[in-house]
Amino acid sequence: MKAVVLTLAVLFLTGSQARHFWQQDEPQSPWDRVKDLATVYVDAIKDSGRDYVSQFEASALGKQLNLKLLDNWDSLTTSFSKLREQLGPVTQEFWDNLEKETEALRQEMNKDVEEMKTKVQPYLDEFQKKWQEEVELYRQKVEPLGSELREGARQKLQELQEKLSPLGEELRDRARTHVDSLRTQLAPYSEELRQRLASRLEALKESGGASLADYHAKASEQLSALSEKAKPALEDLRQGLLPVLESFKVSLLSALEEASKKLNAQ
């Protein structure tokens, strides 16, 4: 039940990142989120791709061509794994520097969200209470119908469905009413929070010491540094791919030549 209330709070207020302010868990850093997503994505591609290559090599055409794609695929994934390991510290340094530069702004925004959370909590508690009452009322109305079903079994199933339909619609309508009421109650606070965040950004833009232009320049500087530090790792990847591509090229040309000889011999 609390999860429903927390979800509604997120929808009415700040967006997906707001969930970290309404829960006790510490939020992941941007780098942690990027790293986790990239790891899952790359691993999924690697595993599924290897399966496809293995299936192709096991087919009649794959056996005839004998391209040894599976060996090349393993070499390729090893090169990508090495690249990921080399870039890890570099990207971590980039996120650390960026977070340090924006620490003051994030602290001010966190404080605004915490204050707004305190203001809207009574409305969320009231909504949760009303929702629990509606669910309990629905359960009380449905319970006798369940007894009828057990007694009459199949012949009364259709009757039960007909009786449950209006009850379900009633619960839906009453829930919609409570949600609309909650939205109306939270609207001023949502607007206040939006204005506060806009004010923070405007003040940041007008300040001489820490302007948005400064953040943009620093972020660009960090990205340039990241690009420079990544060049050696990318070059290593390119060098690692050359033997793989050359081996694939030789195997393919050999297979085509063999196929051409067989066609000419027929």
UniProtKB/Swiss-Prot annotation:
<protein>
    <recommendedName>
        <fullName>Apolipoprotein A-I</fullName>
    </recommendedName>
</protein>
<dbReference type="GO" id="GO:0019915">
    <property type="term" value="P:lipid storage"/>
</dbReference>
<dbReference type="GO" id="GO:0010903">
    <property type="term" value="P:negative regulation of very-low-density lipoprotein particle remodeling"/>
</dbReference>
<dbReference type="GO" id="GO:0010875">
    <property type="term" value="P:positive regulation of cholesterol efflux"/>
</dbReference>
<dbReference type="GO" id="GO:0050766">
    <property type="term" value="P:positive regulation of phagocytosis"/>
</dbReference>
<dbReference type="GO" id="GO:0034191">
    <property type="term" value="F:apolipoprotein A-I receptor binding"/>
</dbReference>
<dbReference type="GO" id="GO:0034380">
    <property type="term" value="P:high-density lipoprotein particle assembly"/>
</dbReference>
<dbReference type="GO" id="GO:0019899">
    <property type="term" value="F:enzyme binding"/>
</dbReference>
<comment type="function">
    <text>Participates in the reverse transport of cholesterol from tissues to the liver for excretion by promoting cholesterol efflux from tissues and by acting as a cofactor for the lecithin cholesterol acyltransferase (LCAT). As part of the SPAP complex, activates spermatozoa motility.</text>
</comment>
<dbReference type="GO" id="GO:0032691">
    <property type="term" value="P:negative regulation of interleukin-1 beta production"/>
</dbReference>
<feature type="signal peptide">
    <location>
        <begin position="1"/>
        <end position="18"/>
    </location>
</feature>
<dbReference type="GO" id="GO:0050821">
    <property type="term" value="P:protein stabilization"/>
</dbReference>
<dbReference type="GO" id="GO:0055091">
    <property type="term" value="P:phospholipid homeostasis"/>
</dbReference>
<feature type="repeat" description="6">
    <location>
        <begin position="166"/>
        <end position="187"/>
    </location>
</feature>
<feature type="repeat" description="2">
    <location>
        <begin position="89"/>
        <end position="110"/>
    </location>
</feature>
<dbReference type="GO" id="GO:0002719">
    <property type="term" value="P:negative regulation of cytokine production involved in immune response"/>
</dbReference>
<dbReference type="GO" id="GO:0043691">
    <property type="term" value="P:reverse cholesterol transport"/>
</dbReference>
<dbReference type="GO" id="GO:0001935">
    <property type="term" value="P:endothelial cell proliferation"/>
</dbReference>
<dbReference type="GO" id="GO:0043534">
    <property type="term" value="P:blood vessel endothelial cell migration"/>
</dbReference>
<keyword id="KW-0445">Lipid transport</keyword>
<keyword id="KW-0345">HDL</keyword>
<comment type="similarity">
    <text>Belongs to the apolipoprotein A1/A4/E family.</text>
</comment>
<dbReference type="GO" id="GO:0120020">
    <property type="term" value="F:cholesterol transfer activity"/>
</dbReference>
<dbReference type="GO" id="GO:0042158">
    <property type="term" value="P:lipoprotein biosynthetic process"/>
</dbReference>
<dbReference type="GO" id="GO:0001540">
    <property type="term" value="F:amyloid-beta binding"/>
</dbReference>
<dbReference type="GO" id="GO:0042627">
    <property type="term" value="C:chylomicron"/>
</dbReference>
<feature type="repeat" description="5">
    <location>
        <begin position="144"/>
        <end position="165"/>
    </location>
</feature>
<keyword id="KW-0443">Lipid metabolism</keyword>
<dbReference type="GO" id="GO:0010804">
    <property type="term" value="P:negative regulation of tumor necrosis factor-mediated signaling pathway"/>
</dbReference>
<dbReference type="GO" id="GO:0034362">
    <property type="term" value="C:low-density lipoprotein particle"/>
</dbReference>
<dbReference type="GO" id="GO:0060228">
    <property type="term" value="F:phosphatidylcholine-sterol O-acyltransferase activator activity"/>
</dbReference>
<feature type="modified residue" description="Methionine sulfoxide">
    <location>
        <position position="109"/>
    </location>
</feature>
<keyword id="KW-0732">Signal</keyword>
<keyword id="KW-0558">Oxidation</keyword>
<feature type="repeat" description="4">
    <location>
        <begin position="122"/>
        <end position="143"/>
    </location>
</feature>
<dbReference type="GO" id="GO:0033344">
    <property type="term" value="P:cholesterol efflux"/>
</dbReference>
<dbReference type="GO" id="GO:0042632">
    <property type="term" value="P:cholesterol homeostasis"/>
</dbReference>
<dbReference type="GO" id="GO:0030325">
    <property type="term" value="P:adrenal gland development"/>
</dbReference>
<feature type="region of interest" description="10 X approximate tandem repeats">
    <location>
        <begin position="67"/>
        <end position="266"/>
    </location>
</feature>
<dbReference type="GO" id="GO:0034375">
    <property type="term" value="P:high-density lipoprotein particle remodeling"/>
</dbReference>
<keyword id="KW-0597">Phosphoprotein</keyword>
<dbReference type="GO" id="GO:0035025">
    <property type="term" value="P:positive regulation of Rho protein signal transduction"/>
</dbReference>
